[in-house]
Amino acid sequence: MWRRWLCPCCSCCACFPFTADGEDNQKAMKSIRSVYKIGHGPSSSHTVGPYRAAKILGQRYPEADAWQVTLCGSLAFTGEGHGTGKAIRAALPGAEIIFNREEENLPHPNTMIFKALKDGEVIITKRVFSIGGGSIRIEGESPDEEKEIYPQNSFAEILQCCKQEGISLTEFIYRYEGEAVKDYLRMVWSVMQEAIQRGLKAEGILPGGLGVSRKAKLLFEMRCYNENADVTMNRLIAAYAYAVSEENADENLVVTAPTCGSSGVLPAVLYYMQHDRGFPEDEILDALAAGGIIGNLIRTNASISGAECGCQAEIGSACSMTAAALATLYGLNIDQIEYAAEIAMDHNLGLTCDPVNGLVQIPCIERNAVAAMRAISSVNLSRFLYATRKISFDEVVATMYRTGKDMDEKYRETSHGGLAQLYAAKN
Protein backbone atom coordinates (compact mmCIF):
# COMPACT_ATOMS: atom_id res chain seq x y z
CA MET A 1 0.00 0.00 0.00
CA TRP A 2 2.84 2.36 0.81
CA ARG A 3 6.27 2.86 -0.66
CA ARG A 4 9.26 4.89 0.35
CA TRP A 5 9.99 8.09 -1.48
CA LEU A 6 13.31 9.92 -1.28
CA CYS A 7 13.03 13.68 -0.90
CA PRO A 8 14.97 15.31 -3.78
CA CYS A 9 16.46 18.06 -1.62
CA CYS A 10 17.60 16.15 1.46
CA SER A 11 18.16 12.68 2.84
CA CYS A 12 14.81 12.32 4.56
CA CYS A 13 12.11 9.92 3.49
CA ALA A 14 8.36 10.35 3.34
CA CYS A 15 5.55 7.97 2.56
CA PHE A 16 3.11 8.59 -0.24
CA PRO A 17 -0.02 6.56 -0.90
CA PHE A 18 -1.29 4.74 -3.88
CA THR A 19 -4.63 5.62 -5.40
CA ALA A 20 -7.79 3.74 -4.43
CA ASP A 21 -7.42 1.34 -7.32
CA GLY A 22 -3.83 0.46 -6.42
CA GLU A 23 -2.20 2.61 -9.08
CA ASP A 24 0.98 4.43 -8.10
CA ASN A 25 0.01 7.97 -7.16
CA GLN A 26 3.43 9.48 -7.84
CA LYS A 27 2.56 11.41 -10.99
CA ALA A 28 2.36 14.95 -12.26
CA MET A 29 -0.34 17.24 -10.90
CA LYS A 30 -3.23 18.80 -12.74
CA SER A 31 -4.25 22.44 -12.74
CA ILE A 32 -5.42 24.15 -9.57
CA ARG A 33 -8.64 24.72 -11.50
CA SER A 34 -9.50 21.12 -10.60
CA VAL A 35 -9.47 22.09 -6.90
CA TYR A 36 -11.84 25.04 -7.30
CA LYS A 37 -15.06 23.83 -8.92
CA ILE A 38 -18.22 25.93 -9.05
CA GLY A 39 -21.35 23.94 -8.28
CA HIS A 40 -24.40 23.51 -6.11
CA GLY A 41 -24.21 22.09 -2.59
CA PRO A 42 -24.51 20.38 -0.30
CA SER A 43 -21.74 17.89 -1.15
CA SER A 44 -19.13 17.85 -3.88
CA SER A 45 -18.75 14.06 -3.72
CA HIS A 46 -22.47 13.37 -3.27
CA THR A 47 -24.02 15.99 -5.58
CA VAL A 48 -21.47 17.70 -7.85
CA GLY A 49 -19.63 14.47 -8.74
CA PRO A 50 -22.76 12.34 -9.34
CA TYR A 51 -24.33 15.13 -11.41
CA ARG A 52 -21.21 15.37 -13.58
CA ALA A 53 -21.12 11.59 -14.01
CA ALA A 54 -24.79 11.50 -14.99
CA LYS A 55 -24.35 14.41 -17.40
CA ILE A 56 -21.34 12.83 -19.12
CA LEU A 57 -22.95 9.41 -19.51
CA GLY A 58 -26.27 10.87 -20.61
CA GLN A 59 -24.53 12.77 -23.39
CA ARG A 60 -22.45 9.74 -24.32
CA TYR A 61 -25.46 7.41 -24.69
CA PRO A 62 -28.33 9.53 -26.05
CA GLU A 63 -30.05 6.40 -27.39
CA ALA A 64 -30.90 5.27 -23.84
CA ASP A 65 -34.57 5.73 -22.96
CA ALA A 66 -34.15 4.91 -19.26
CA TRP A 67 -31.43 4.87 -16.62
CA GLN A 68 -30.89 2.90 -13.43
CA VAL A 69 -28.28 4.19 -10.99
CA THR A 70 -27.15 2.14 -7.99
CA LEU A 71 -25.44 4.02 -5.17
CA CYS A 72 -23.02 2.06 -2.98
CA GLY A 73 -20.93 2.73 0.10
CA SER A 74 -21.14 6.22 1.57
CA LEU A 75 -23.37 7.33 -1.29
CA ALA A 76 -25.91 4.71 -0.26
CA PHE A 77 -25.78 5.58 3.45
CA THR A 78 -25.87 9.38 3.23
CA GLY A 79 -27.02 9.99 -0.34
CA GLU A 80 -30.62 10.66 0.67
CA GLY A 81 -29.62 13.39 3.11
CA HIS A 82 -27.14 14.83 0.63
CA GLY A 83 -29.64 14.86 -2.25
CA THR A 84 -27.64 12.54 -4.52
CA GLY A 85 -30.72 11.23 -6.31
CA LYS A 86 -31.93 14.76 -6.99
CA ALA A 87 -28.54 15.68 -8.45
CA ILE A 88 -28.50 12.64 -10.74
CA ARG A 89 -32.07 13.24 -11.92
CA ALA A 90 -31.16 16.83 -12.78
CA ALA A 91 -28.95 15.34 -15.51
CA LEU A 92 -30.93 12.13 -16.16
CA PRO A 93 -34.63 12.93 -15.63
CA GLY A 94 -36.63 9.96 -14.41
CA ALA A 95 -33.59 7.86 -13.50
CA GLU A 96 -34.30 5.03 -11.07
CA ILE A 97 -32.10 5.41 -7.98
CA ILE A 98 -31.22 2.30 -5.96
CA PHE A 99 -29.50 2.51 -2.56
CA ASN A 100 -27.34 -0.59 -2.12
CA ARG A 101 -26.24 -0.60 1.52
CA GLU A 102 -25.10 -4.23 1.50
CA GLU A 103 -22.22 -4.11 -0.99
CA GLU A 104 -18.77 -4.42 0.59
CA ASN A 105 -15.16 -4.47 -0.65
CA LEU A 106 -15.79 -1.56 -2.97
CA PRO A 107 -12.89 -0.07 -4.96
CA HIS A 108 -13.95 3.34 -3.62
CA PRO A 109 -16.45 4.25 -0.87
CA ASN A 110 -18.32 6.54 -3.28
CA THR A 111 -19.20 4.03 -6.00
CA MET A 112 -22.04 4.39 -8.52
CA ILE A 113 -23.23 1.86 -11.09
CA PHE A 114 -24.95 3.42 -14.09
CA LYS A 115 -27.07 1.21 -16.34
CA ALA A 116 -28.39 2.62 -19.60
CA LEU A 117 -31.51 0.89 -20.92
CA LYS A 118 -33.29 0.87 -24.25
CA ASP A 119 -36.63 -0.87 -24.72
CA GLY A 120 -36.19 -2.51 -21.32
CA GLU A 121 -32.77 -3.99 -22.12
CA VAL A 122 -29.47 -2.91 -20.57
CA ILE A 123 -27.23 -1.55 -23.32
CA ILE A 124 -24.30 -0.38 -21.21
CA THR A 125 -23.10 -0.61 -17.61
CA LYS A 126 -20.55 1.82 -16.19
CA ARG A 127 -19.05 1.94 -12.73
CA VAL A 128 -18.11 5.46 -11.63
CA PHE A 129 -16.28 6.69 -8.54
CA SER A 130 -16.90 10.11 -7.01
CA ILE A 131 -13.42 10.70 -5.65
CA GLY A 132 -13.93 14.01 -3.84
CA GLY A 133 -14.17 17.70 -4.63
CA GLY A 134 -16.59 17.05 -7.49
CA SER A 135 -14.05 14.94 -9.39
CA ILE A 136 -15.04 11.58 -10.83
CA ARG A 137 -13.32 8.58 -12.36
CA ILE A 138 -15.06 6.22 -14.75
CA GLU A 139 -13.73 2.68 -14.31
CA GLY A 140 -11.36 1.69 -17.09
CA GLU A 141 -10.97 5.25 -18.35
CA SER A 142 -8.50 8.03 -17.65
CA PRO A 143 -9.68 10.70 -15.20
CA ASP A 144 -12.00 13.37 -16.53
CA GLU A 145 -9.83 16.26 -15.43
CA GLU A 146 -7.55 18.59 -17.35
CA LYS A 147 -4.09 17.58 -18.46
CA GLU A 148 -1.29 17.14 -15.97
CA ILE A 149 0.73 20.35 -16.03
CA TYR A 150 3.08 20.18 -13.04
CA PRO A 151 6.11 17.88 -13.27
CA GLN A 152 6.44 18.20 -9.48
CA ASN A 153 4.15 16.19 -7.20
CA SER A 154 5.38 17.05 -3.71
CA PHE A 155 5.95 20.23 -1.76
CA ALA A 156 9.59 19.20 -1.34
CA GLU A 157 10.07 19.31 -5.11
CA ILE A 158 8.24 22.64 -5.37
CA LEU A 159 10.34 24.06 -2.55
CA GLN A 160 13.54 22.91 -4.24
CA CYS A 161 12.49 24.48 -7.55
CA CYS A 162 11.54 27.81 -5.95
CA LYS A 163 14.79 28.07 -3.99
CA GLN A 164 17.02 27.03 -6.88
CA GLU A 165 15.44 29.55 -9.23
CA GLY A 166 14.80 32.30 -6.70
CA ILE A 167 11.06 32.52 -7.32
CA SER A 168 8.07 32.74 -5.01
CA LEU A 169 5.39 30.08 -4.67
CA THR A 170 2.91 32.14 -6.68
CA GLU A 171 5.50 32.78 -9.41
CA PHE A 172 6.03 29.02 -9.55
CA ILE A 173 2.28 28.44 -9.92
CA TYR A 174 1.82 31.01 -12.69
CA ARG A 175 4.84 29.63 -14.55
CA TYR A 176 3.00 26.34 -15.06
CA GLU A 177 -0.61 27.53 -15.05
CA GLY A 178 -0.07 30.62 -17.17
CA GLU A 179 -1.35 34.09 -16.33
CA ALA A 180 -4.77 33.12 -17.74
CA VAL A 181 -5.48 31.15 -14.58
CA LYS A 182 -5.96 34.50 -12.84
CA ASP A 183 -9.15 35.01 -14.85
CA TYR A 184 -10.45 31.69 -13.56
CA LEU A 185 -9.46 32.58 -10.00
CA ARG A 186 -11.21 35.93 -10.38
CA MET A 187 -14.41 34.12 -11.38
CA VAL A 188 -13.99 31.72 -8.45
CA TRP A 189 -13.48 34.62 -6.05
CA SER A 190 -16.58 36.35 -7.38
CA VAL A 191 -18.72 33.26 -6.70
CA MET A 192 -17.21 32.90 -3.22
CA GLN A 193 -18.00 36.52 -2.37
CA GLU A 194 -21.54 36.23 -3.68
CA ALA A 195 -22.13 33.17 -1.50
CA ILE A 196 -21.01 35.12 1.57
CA GLN A 197 -23.12 38.14 0.70
CA ARG A 198 -26.25 36.02 0.14
CA GLY A 199 -25.63 34.03 3.30
CA LEU A 200 -25.24 37.13 5.46
CA LYS A 201 -28.71 38.30 4.45
CA ALA A 202 -30.59 34.99 4.52
CA GLU A 203 -32.68 33.78 7.44
CA GLY A 204 -34.85 30.76 8.21
CA ILE A 205 -34.50 27.02 8.63
CA LEU A 206 -32.21 24.91 6.48
CA PRO A 207 -33.81 22.00 4.57
CA GLY A 208 -33.52 18.37 5.63
CA GLY A 209 -35.61 18.08 8.77
CA LEU A 210 -33.02 18.81 11.46
CA GLY A 211 -34.50 22.23 12.15
CA VAL A 212 -31.13 23.97 11.94
CA SER A 213 -31.57 27.73 11.70
CA ARG A 214 -29.28 30.00 9.74
CA LYS A 215 -26.89 31.88 12.03
CA ALA A 216 -24.60 33.88 9.71
CA LYS A 217 -26.75 37.03 9.80
CA LEU A 218 -26.96 36.88 13.60
CA LEU A 219 -23.18 36.49 13.95
CA PHE A 220 -22.56 39.31 11.51
CA GLU A 221 -24.89 41.80 13.16
CA MET A 222 -24.56 40.98 16.88
CA ARG A 223 -21.78 42.63 18.87
CA CYS A 224 -20.65 41.97 22.43
CA TYR A 225 -20.58 44.84 24.90
CA ASN A 226 -17.10 46.42 24.71
CA GLU A 227 -16.12 43.96 21.96
CA ASN A 228 -12.38 44.16 21.30
CA ALA A 229 -10.68 43.88 17.91
CA ASP A 230 -9.79 40.19 18.28
CA VAL A 231 -13.35 39.21 19.17
CA THR A 232 -14.68 41.26 16.26
CA MET A 233 -12.29 39.56 13.83
CA ASN A 234 -13.24 36.07 15.02
CA ARG A 235 -16.95 36.89 14.96
CA LEU A 236 -16.84 38.28 11.43
CA ILE A 237 -14.75 35.43 10.05
CA ALA A 238 -17.11 32.94 11.68
CA ALA A 239 -20.07 34.80 10.17
CA TYR A 240 -18.53 34.58 6.70
CA ALA A 241 -17.79 30.86 7.12
CA TYR A 242 -21.33 30.22 8.33
CA ALA A 243 -22.71 32.23 5.40
CA VAL A 244 -21.03 30.04 2.78
CA SER A 245 -21.69 26.79 4.64
CA GLU A 246 -25.37 27.62 5.09
CA GLU A 247 -25.66 28.49 1.41
CA ASN A 248 -24.06 25.13 0.67
CA ALA A 249 -26.47 23.30 2.98
CA ASP A 250 -29.33 25.05 1.17
CA GLU A 251 -28.07 23.61 -2.15
CA ASN A 252 -27.01 27.00 -3.50
CA LEU A 253 -23.98 27.91 -5.61
CA VAL A 254 -20.57 27.61 -3.91
CA VAL A 255 -16.98 26.78 -4.82
CA THR A 256 -15.27 23.58 -3.71
CA ALA A 257 -12.30 24.53 -1.56
CA PRO A 258 -11.48 21.72 -1.80
CA THR A 259 -15.01 20.29 -1.22
CA CYS A 260 -18.51 21.66 -0.80
CA GLY A 261 -18.64 20.52 2.82
CA SER A 262 -15.52 22.58 3.58
CA SER A 263 -16.31 25.44 1.19
CA GLY A 264 -16.67 28.09 3.89
CA VAL A 265 -13.16 28.05 5.37
CA LEU A 266 -11.00 29.69 2.70
CA PRO A 267 -13.46 32.35 1.48
CA ALA A 268 -14.24 33.40 5.06
CA VAL A 269 -10.64 34.36 5.83
CA LEU A 270 -9.93 35.94 2.45
CA TYR A 271 -13.21 37.91 2.49
CA TYR A 272 -12.27 39.34 5.87
CA MET A 273 -8.81 40.25 4.62
CA GLN A 274 -10.18 42.09 1.57
CA HIS A 275 -13.33 43.70 2.94
CA ASP A 276 -12.28 44.36 6.54
CA ARG A 277 -8.52 44.68 6.25
CA GLY A 278 -8.23 46.25 2.79
CA PHE A 279 -6.04 43.77 0.91
CA PRO A 280 -6.38 44.34 -2.88
CA GLU A 281 -8.05 41.75 -5.09
CA ASP A 282 -4.89 40.90 -7.04
CA GLU A 283 -3.25 39.78 -3.79
CA ILE A 284 -6.35 37.79 -2.88
CA LEU A 285 -6.04 35.96 -6.22
CA ASP A 286 -2.40 35.14 -5.45
CA ALA A 287 -3.53 33.76 -2.09
CA LEU A 288 -6.14 31.62 -3.84
CA ALA A 289 -3.43 30.28 -6.13
CA ALA A 290 -1.26 29.31 -3.15
CA GLY A 291 -4.20 27.65 -1.42
CA GLY A 292 -4.98 25.84 -4.65
CA ILE A 293 -1.54 24.28 -4.96
CA ILE A 294 -1.80 22.98 -1.39
CA GLY A 295 -5.21 21.45 -2.14
CA ASN A 296 -3.77 20.04 -5.34
CA LEU A 297 -0.93 18.33 -3.49
CA ILE A 298 -3.35 16.80 -1.00
CA ARG A 299 -5.75 15.47 -3.65
CA THR A 300 -2.82 14.11 -5.71
CA ASN A 301 -0.96 12.39 -2.87
CA ALA A 302 -3.79 11.53 -0.48
CA SER A 303 -7.51 12.32 -0.61
CA ILE A 304 -9.96 15.18 -0.12
CA SER A 305 -12.91 12.80 0.31
CA GLY A 306 -14.65 12.45 3.67
CA ALA A 307 -15.92 9.05 2.59
CA GLU A 308 -12.36 7.88 2.03
CA CYS A 309 -10.43 9.56 4.85
CA GLY A 310 -12.90 11.26 7.19
CA CYS A 311 -13.38 14.97 7.79
CA GLN A 312 -9.63 15.48 8.17
CA ALA A 313 -9.51 15.14 4.37
CA GLU A 314 -12.10 17.88 3.92
CA ILE A 315 -11.90 20.37 6.79
CA GLY A 316 -8.24 19.51 7.41
CA SER A 317 -7.41 20.17 3.76
CA ALA A 318 -9.44 23.39 3.72
CA CYS A 319 -7.67 24.58 6.87
CA SER A 320 -4.30 23.79 5.31
CA MET A 321 -5.19 25.58 2.07
CA THR A 322 -6.38 28.61 4.01
CA ALA A 323 -3.24 28.77 6.13
CA ALA A 324 -1.07 28.72 3.00
CA ALA A 325 -3.26 31.35 1.35
CA LEU A 326 -3.10 33.68 4.34
CA ALA A 327 0.65 33.20 4.76
CA THR A 328 1.05 34.15 1.10
CA LEU A 329 -1.17 37.20 1.58
CA TYR A 330 1.02 38.28 4.50
CA GLY A 331 4.12 37.97 2.33
CA LEU A 332 5.72 35.15 4.31
CA ASN A 333 8.48 33.08 2.76
CA ILE A 334 7.95 29.63 1.29
CA ASP A 335 9.23 27.84 4.40
CA GLN A 336 6.73 29.73 6.53
CA ILE A 337 3.96 28.97 4.04
CA GLU A 338 4.77 25.28 4.16
CA TYR A 339 4.88 25.25 7.95
CA ALA A 340 1.53 27.08 8.20
CA ALA A 341 -0.07 24.48 5.93
CA GLU A 342 1.55 21.64 7.90
CA ILE A 343 0.37 22.95 11.29
CA ALA A 344 -3.16 23.38 9.97
CA MET A 345 -3.36 19.79 8.77
CA ASP A 346 -1.48 18.36 11.74
CA HIS A 347 -4.11 19.55 14.19
CA ASN A 348 -7.00 18.17 12.18
CA LEU A 349 -5.57 14.64 12.00
CA GLY A 350 -8.12 12.02 13.01
CA LEU A 351 -11.12 14.31 12.52
CA THR A 352 -14.15 12.11 11.83
CA CYS A 353 -16.87 12.61 9.24
CA ASP A 354 -20.10 11.82 11.10
CA PRO A 355 -22.82 14.11 9.69
CA VAL A 356 -26.06 13.99 11.66
CA ASN A 357 -28.91 12.55 9.56
CA GLY A 358 -26.52 12.45 6.60
CA LEU A 359 -26.87 16.21 6.15
CA VAL A 360 -24.02 18.67 5.65
CA GLN A 361 -25.14 20.72 8.66
CA ILE A 362 -24.16 19.27 12.07
CA PRO A 363 -21.23 19.49 12.77
CA CYS A 364 -20.16 20.60 9.30
CA ILE A 365 -21.22 24.25 9.33
CA GLU A 366 -19.66 25.01 12.69
CA ARG A 367 -16.47 23.18 11.71
CA ASN A 368 -15.94 25.57 8.82
CA ALA A 369 -15.87 28.51 11.21
CA VAL A 370 -13.54 26.78 13.68
CA ALA A 371 -11.16 25.72 10.88
CA ALA A 372 -11.01 29.28 9.54
CA MET A 373 -9.83 30.57 12.92
CA ARG A 374 -7.43 27.64 13.31
CA ALA A 375 -5.84 28.53 9.98
CA ILE A 376 -5.07 32.02 11.27
CA SER A 377 -3.45 30.58 14.40
CA SER A 378 -1.36 28.27 12.21
CA VAL A 379 -0.01 31.23 10.26
CA ASN A 380 0.80 33.13 13.44
CA LEU A 381 2.84 30.19 14.74
CA SER A 382 4.62 29.68 11.44
CA ARG A 383 5.92 33.26 11.44
CA PHE A 384 8.15 32.57 14.41
CA LEU A 385 8.80 28.83 14.60
CA TYR A 386 9.30 27.69 11.00
CA ALA A 387 13.05 27.22 11.46
CA THR A 388 12.53 24.74 14.32
CA ARG A 389 9.99 22.40 12.71
CA LYS A 390 10.61 18.66 12.43
CA ILE A 391 7.68 17.55 10.23
CA SER A 392 7.25 18.48 6.57
CA PHE A 393 3.99 19.21 4.79
CA ASP A 394 4.45 16.11 2.64
CA GLU A 395 4.81 13.95 5.74
CA VAL A 396 1.66 15.27 7.39
CA VAL A 397 -0.32 14.70 4.18
CA ALA A 398 0.92 11.11 4.05
CA THR A 399 -0.03 10.72 7.72
CA MET A 400 -3.52 12.06 7.05
CA TYR A 401 -4.04 9.53 4.29
CA ARG A 402 -2.80 6.62 6.38
CA THR A 403 -4.95 7.76 9.33
CA GLY A 404 -7.98 7.93 7.06
CA LYS A 405 -7.40 4.44 5.74
CA ASP A 406 -7.08 3.15 9.31
CA MET A 407 -10.35 4.81 10.33
CA ASP A 408 -13.42 2.65 10.86
CA GLU A 409 -15.89 3.24 8.03
CA LYS A 410 -18.54 4.45 10.50
CA TYR A 411 -16.43 7.60 10.85
CA ARG A 412 -16.11 8.09 7.10
CA GLU A 413 -19.36 9.72 5.95
CA THR A 414 -21.72 6.85 6.63
CA SER A 415 -23.55 8.45 9.59
CA HIS A 416 -23.10 5.18 11.50
CA GLY A 417 -20.88 6.53 14.27
CA GLY A 418 -19.96 9.54 16.37
CA LEU A 419 -22.37 12.45 16.58
CA ALA A 420 -24.66 10.94 13.95
CA GLN A 421 -25.11 7.73 15.92
CA LEU A 422 -25.67 9.50 19.25
CA TYR A 423 -28.19 11.88 17.72
CA ALA A 424 -30.08 9.04 16.05
CA ALA A 425 -30.18 7.09 19.33
CA LYS A 426 -31.86 9.89 21.24
CA ASN A 427 -34.40 10.81 18.55
Per-segment meaning from a language model:
Residues 2-5:
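Tryptophan (W) side chains
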Residues 36-54, 250-269, 311-319:
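Conserved phosphate/anionic-ligand binding catalytic regions in large, soluble enzymes, centered on
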Residues 326-427:
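Functionally critical mobile loop/hinge segments
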